[in-house]
């Protein structure tokens, strides 16, 4: 089972310095626990600050063997500048394609990048899977499977700790996404817990992606991964 953690320093207490320090400490715990991937998703940071944090995370992760792979959310420029292991692409317009990112990595004499892609519908999954080989992502993050924090109220939402939680796509949709994505591995995202992770694997997922799960239980990250 692949395990893919996503950062969110806003969940830590203290000032900016304290939060970045806590994030690095979390990364060290995750690496020691055997996480496979860590996505740096701190899009409010300036380019310089994001690159600085990426370099510190890379040093932290690469102190472990095997070292988890670090992916930078959306910012291929930062990934290249820091020699990160890859890039995570969202559905936002204007981003580079997987093929373009691979070309840039090759031009910089860097190893083949890991490229993950967010998909929220079966159509998005099908488009990714039917792309030319060089344009396919390494992994697809499909979700939200169980739930997602949203800003607006909706009949399918409940309030938890003053936040709105929307019902996810469910396991049947995840199963369909895994079939549509073949041969691209799919990681389940959205409301993943220790209690429901096994059900996503039974539905065909190759692993799980999460923020809260790995923040709350960094040293108990479910079954052993397959590096």
Stretches found by the model and what they are:
Residues 1-96, 108-138, 165-172, 176-186, ...:
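Conserved N-terminal beta1-alpha1 strand-loop-helix module at the mouth
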Residues 145, 192-193, 209:
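Gly/Ser/Thr-rich beta-alpha loop segments that engage phosphate groups in nucleotides
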Residues 150-152, 163:
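Glycine/threonine-rich flexible loop motifs
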Residues 137-146:
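Non-cysteine beta-strand/loop elements that form the S-adenosyl-L-methionine
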Residues 156-159, 225-226:
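Serine residues within intrinsically disordered or low-complexity segments
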Residues 44, 146-149:
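Feature marks short, surface-exposed loop/turn motifs that line or immediately flank catalytic pockets
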Residues 100, 105, 126-129, 146:
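Acidic/glycine-enriched connector segments
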């Amino acid at each position: 089972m692949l395990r893919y953690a996503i950062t969110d320093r806003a969940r830590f207490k203290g000032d900016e310095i304290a939060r970045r320090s806590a994030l690095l400490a979390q990364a060290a715990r995750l690496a020691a626990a055997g996480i496979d991937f860590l996505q740096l998703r701190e899009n409010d940071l300036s380019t310089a600050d994001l690159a600085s944090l990426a370099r510190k995370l890379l040093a932290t992760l690469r102190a472990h063997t095997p070292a988890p792979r670090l992916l930078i959310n959306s910012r291929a420029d930062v990934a290249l500048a820091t020699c990160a292991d890859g890039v995570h692409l969202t559905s936002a317009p204007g981003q580079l394609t997987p093929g373009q990112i691979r070309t840039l990595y090759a031009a910089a004499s860097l190893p083949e990048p890991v490229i993950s892609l967010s998909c929220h519908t079966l159509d998005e999954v099908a488009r990714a899977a039917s792309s030319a080989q060089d344009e396919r992502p390494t992994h697809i993050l499909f979700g939200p499977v169980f739930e997602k924090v949203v800003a607006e109220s909706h009949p399918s939402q409940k309030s938890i700790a003053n936040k709105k939680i929307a019902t996810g796509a469910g396991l049947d949709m995840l199963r369909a996404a895994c079939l549509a994505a073949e041969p691209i591995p799919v990681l389940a995202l959205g409301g993943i817990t220790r209690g429901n992770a096994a059900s996503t694997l039974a539905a065909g997922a190759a692993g799980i992606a999460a923020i809260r799960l790995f923040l709350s239980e960094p040293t108990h990250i479910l079954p052993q991964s397959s590096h």
